UniProtKB/Swiss-Prot annotation:
Disulfide cysteine pairs (residue numbers): 37-72, 39-65, 55-73
Compartment list: Secreted; Nematocyst
Molecular function via GO: ion channel inhibitor activity; potassium channel regulator activity; toxin activity
Entry's Gene Ontology BP terms: regulation of blood pressure
Family in the record: Belongs to the sea anemone type 3 (BDS) potassium channel toxin family.
Keywords: Disulfide bond, Hypotensive agent, Ion channel impairing toxin, Nematocyst, Potassium channel impairing toxin, Secreted, Signal, Toxin, Voltage-gated potassium channel impairing toxin
Location (main, coarse): secreted
Record propeptide residues: 20-33
UniProt name for this protein: Kappa-actitoxin-Avd4o
InterPro entries: BDS_K_chnl_tox, Myo_ane_neurotoxin_sf
Residues making up the signal peptide according to the UniProt record: 1-19
Role noted for this protein: Blocks Kv3 voltage-gated potassium channels. Reduces blood pressure.
Pfam families, per database record: Defensin_4
Amino acid sequence: MNKALFLSLVVLCAAVVFAAEDLQKAKHAPFKLAAPCFCSGKPGRGDLWIFRGTCPGGYGYTSNCYKWPNICCYPH
């Protein structure tokens, strides 16, 4: 009985360690809250940011067009 309890505790501890490691990776994963959009006269697809007046920093956006009250931001 003691060996089974010890083995159960070891498995439980290992599961906690692996779950915590996955959470650390998830914190640093890139995540955008944008939908695809298209602007006339611009090739490709942009990112539609809802209820924003400007494009957010840190994503490499270089141009945009307004689709009131939203903005469509282009990375190239």
